[in-house]
Amino acid sequence: MSFLKSFPPPGSADGLRLQQPDTEAVLNGKGLGTGTLYIAESRLSWLDGSGLGFSLEYPTISLHAVSRDPNAYPQEHLYVMVNAKLGEESKEPPSDEDEEDNDDIEPISEFRFVPSDKSALEAMFTAMCECQALHPDPEDEDSDDYDGEEYDVEAHEQGQGDIPTFYTYEEGLSHLTAEGQATLERLEGMLSQSVSSQYNMAGVRTEDSVRNYEDGMEVETTPTVAGQFEDADVDH
């Protein structure tokens, strides 16, 4: 494959964390051969016995995991997903229709690194996690920034800015229209009726009306309703 190139293997200057020999590389289901996997702080690299291989930049890696599912692949391996289409040569130029269909599909490539020593998978995964953490996604950092409208204090002091408007409850009422005030009064009336009904329903005290809590003390708040269960025993 044309994307395989010759380059010197990563070393200590690249922050090499792990070197795993005798590791098969598989790209999108096609075997690339057996070589050495290099997990360095700067990049992830693989080289075969002839010195040909490839390197992956961590910002392009969207997922890595240890796969032990035989239905996905017959051997346990380190799975790596890359946000790019690698290793495929197009024999025919794509048509305009194909380009439109592919616009909404993000290109990905799937790598599987299969070491002969399966006990090394945990160390490979740990090294990948540590190196990936050194290359945070810039988009994640941008999402933490406040993107709301900023109040320019300096511009306000120069008379060029608008002061954000805040109202107290009383001040807010004065800014209501006649329709708004009528709506507010109607809602307040409905609320007061709702509060009253929860204490007395059909002339019978509800469980919630028996006691109210003031300063952490249980107190009786509603007097006994006349004509209702006068012969009942009440504990005081």
UniProtKB/Swiss-Prot annotation:
The modification Phosphothreonine is found at T222. Residues 88-109 are annotated as: Disordered. InterPro entries: ICln, ICln/Lot5/Saf5, PH-like_dom_sf. The modification N-acetylserine is found at S2. One of its GO terms (biological process) is positive regulation of mRNA splicing, via spliceosome. Pfam families: Voldacs. It is found in: Cytoplasm, Cytosol; Nucleus; Cytoplasm, Cytoskeleton. Residues 95-107 have a biased composition (Acidic residues). The modification Phosphoserine is found at S95, S143, S192, S194, S197, S209. GO terms for cellular component: cytoskeleton; cytosol; methylosome; nucleus; pICln-Sm protein complex; plasma membrane. Involved in both the assembly of spliceosomal snRNPs and the methylation of Sm proteins. Chaperone that regulates the assembly of spliceosomal U1, U2, U4 and U5 small nuclear ribonucleoproteins (snRNPs), the building blocks of the spliceosome, and thereby plays an important role in the splicing of cellular pre-mRNAs. Most spliceosomal snRNPs contain a common set of Sm proteins SNRPB, SNRPD1, SNRPD2, SNRPD3, SNRPE, SNRPF and SNRPG that assemble in a heptameric protein ring on the Sm site of the small nuclear RNA to form the core snRNP (Sm core). Belongs to the pICln (TC 1.A.47) family. Component of the methylosome, a 20S complex containing at least PRMT5/SKB1, WDR77/MEP50 and CLNS1A/pICln. May mediate SNRPD1 and SNRPD3 methylation. Forms a 6S pICln-Sm complex composed of CLNS1A/pICln, SNRPD1, SNRPD2, SNRPE, SNRPF and SNRPG; ring-like structure where CLNS1A/pICln mimics additional Sm proteins and which is unable to assemble into the core snRNP. Interacts with LSM10 and LSM11. PANTHER family: CHLORIDE CONDUCTANCE REGULATORY PROTEIN ICLN, METHYLOSOME SUBUNIT PICLN. This is Methylosome subunit pICln. It comes from Mus musculus (Mouse). The gene is Clns1a.
